[in-house]
């Protein structure tokens, strides 16, 4: 059985006027498999479909191969995250 690729999630931008209630800052990076508990649950909820698409061989239309960009659903914060598939 093939090994699953790693998934890295990085906060790349904040568009809202209010800081993140979870304390995330631009530049924070997380290994999804080992650090997902550190991620905001709302952001994780939005990230799950993209993670599954990338991890299992799919691609997200309009995004570079192996990546996806999404926003957290907090309208006052609007953190923008980048998901990257990392092949070992």
Spans of features found by a protein language model:
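Short, compositionally biased
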Residues: 41-58
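Short, charged beta-turn/beta-strand-edge "cap" motif at the junction between a beta-strand
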Residues: 34-40
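Short, structured beta-strand/loop micro-motifs enriched in basic residues and often containing a Trp
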Residues: 5-16
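Short, compact, well-ordered microdomains
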Residues: 57-88
